[in-house]
């Protein structure tokens, strides 16, 4: 995680969760790998847990990711040393978790189930804050519209508000480069999972024409990203998209949030819309009054201070803020 995101995340979540971080910091850290939970429909999801090696109960930072939970080591160690339980979980159908991967589809129910599971861990104090950016921001927003009782706040960084416009399409045109690069990258894990399920190839399969290798020709779109075909089949903003559009469900969100966007981010519009939408339509006073927006100099991959040929200076990272 980029240093500005680490510092920002820990500062903001401390405020949102009202964490009582002990003067004994830094804590020694205990790591538990591949901690499992069951979703309401019986799917096993795997998480890594980083927590203070100390007695007592601590607030939870939860990150649900499609990009491999092992990427959370650095943040997990630092968060736990500062007095948080950090839980990073592979989303359904990704890496170590069970089930089938389909973007956005299960994040609301799986997010709810995971928040409630994390709040009940023996070393948790019952308060859960969700953190992370891009698709990990989407997992927060979709969990928030399901209103899990123990969700205390969210920190979505550089994420969308409508997964049709400004994610898959732009002004009615397919965002082809983003869609194809993103789905192709995600498909690599899907392919790996398929091969691992069928480790023993029949000898005759190995002498088929190269274009006929079964792993690569099962189903449409090679079976690796069939949701991409669904996106193409729904070029207009219809019920397919509305079911998981955050903009359709602002009134269901009941928690404070810090929305972090960047002036040169591909999802800048989403950060602004989420902030304004929940501030106006949030499900309770705490949500409506608890929205904050920070817009930084930077793009989707990180902060400035240099964008192209322009150097905005070392103090530019958090120069723009709104209440």
Residue ranges and their predicted role:
Residues 233-323:
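C-terminal subdomain of alpha/beta-hydrolase-fold enzymes, centered on the catalytic histidine
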Residues 24-56:
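N-terminal cap/lid segment of alpha/beta-hydrolase-fold proteins
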Residues 88, 97, 132, 136-140, ...:
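Catalytic cores of eukaryotic secretory-pathway lumenal/extracellular enzymes that build
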Residues 81, 145-252:
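Accessory cap/linker subdomain of secreted extracellular hydrolases
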Residues 52-120, 162, 166-169, 304-314:
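Cap/lid segment of the alpha/beta-hydrolase catalytic domain
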């Amino acid at each position: 995680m980029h240093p500005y995101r680490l510092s920002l995340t820990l500062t903001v979540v401390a405020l949102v969760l009202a964490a009582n971080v002990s003067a004994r910091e830094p804590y020694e850290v205990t790591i538990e790998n591949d901690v499992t939970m069951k979703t309401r429909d019986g799917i096993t999801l795997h998480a890594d847990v980083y927590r203070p090696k100390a007695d007592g109960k601590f607030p939870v930072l939860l990150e649900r990711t499609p990009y491999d939970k092992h990427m959370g080591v650095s943040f997990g160690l630092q968060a736990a040393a500062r007095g948080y339980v950090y839980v990073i979980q592979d989303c359904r159908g990704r890496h170590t978790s069970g089930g089938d991967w389909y973007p956005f589809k299960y994040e609301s129910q799986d997010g709810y189930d995971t928040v409630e599971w994390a709040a009940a861990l023996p070393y948790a104090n019952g308060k859960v804050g969700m953190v992370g950016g891009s698709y990990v921001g989407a997992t927060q927003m979709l969990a928030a519209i399901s209103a899990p009782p123990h969700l205390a706040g969210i920190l979505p960084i550089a994420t969308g508000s409508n997964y049709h416009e400004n994610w898959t399409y732009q002004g009615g045109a397919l965002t082809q480069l983003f869609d194809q690069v993103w789905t192709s990258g995600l498909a690599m894990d899907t392919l790996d999972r398929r091969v691992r399920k069928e480790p023993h190839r029949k000898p005759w399969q190995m002498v088929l024409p190269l274009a006929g290798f079964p792993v690569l020709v099962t189903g449409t779109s090679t079976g690796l990203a069939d949701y991409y075909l669904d996106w193409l089949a729904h070029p207009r903003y219809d019920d397919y998209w509305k079911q998981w559009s955050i903009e359709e469900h602002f009134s269901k969100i009941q928690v404070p949030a810090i929305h972090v966007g960047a002036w040169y981010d591909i999802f800048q519009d989403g950060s602004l819309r989420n902030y304004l939408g929940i501030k106006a339509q949030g499900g309770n006073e705490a949500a409506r009054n608890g929205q904050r927006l920070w817009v930084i100099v930077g793009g989707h991959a990180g902060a400035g201070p240099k964008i192209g040929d322009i150097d905005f200076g070392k103090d530019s990272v958090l120069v723009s803020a709104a209440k």
